[in-house]
Amino acid sequence: MWDYLKNTTKPIVLYGTGNGADKILNQLSKASIKVSGVFASDGFVRNRSFRGYEVESYSDIKKRLGDVIILMCFGSNRQDVRLNVEKLMQENEFYVPDVPVYGDVIFDANYYEDHKYELELVRSMLADELSVKTFDAIMSYRLSGDISYVFDCEEEEERKLDLIKLPKDSEYLDLGAYNGDTVVKYSEAFKNISSVIAVEPDSKNFKKLCKTVEQMKCGPQVQVVNAVVSDKDGMASLVSSKGRGVHEFSNLVCDVTASNVVPCISVDSLVQDRMVN
């Protein structure tokens, strides 16, 4: 996909203005790929700019540029967003670039070739047709940016939960617990979960998490931790936004002038000598 974008003559526009857009714009800049505009969903335009681009509406982008390539820069499980994406896909050339949650390694054709042995080894270990189909679809999506590959291997929520078999007295770690929605979801779905460690770094979201846990009438014992999960213990100065969760932290170095400093903790420290299922 990245090589294709280098050679296209169509104007390229970004859909979304969050952390994903930052990462995608950085990658495009590194590859000397020009971006012609940025637009947001209706209700999120609000007379603002992003990285030097005026944030436009979809209709304004189309009026100004005509036939465009859209790069979607965020993820969502909301049905209204899904329907809008399907509409945009029908009207435009549309891609969802795969960029890492952390780090800067891009899963492109070169990465695939360099790690082909490991990837084929993983595929050979999959035990059923659905798993192989899903693996192939994810690989095709990550290389092409074509989200329809992912749509083709979707399963109903109940079916996905049925694939998880937990032993009695399992412990569940929620490493980005947000407001506690997934704590509630999986505690209700899996009665074999006896304890939960829910970690959330953002102070506002952490308050929501605590409130959610307090309102749980029954279920597992829940320990809430206001920290950011890392590969080591220490302190981190965070850069928060109004979106879901925390978006960056500065190499686990505590900046004494920062207004938002929280502990960082490793999974090993969270669980100590206990087994995680």
Segments (PLM) and residue ranges:
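Phosphate/nucleotide-binding beta-alpha loop and adjacent structural elements of enzyme active sites
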Residues: 1-31, 35, 41-277
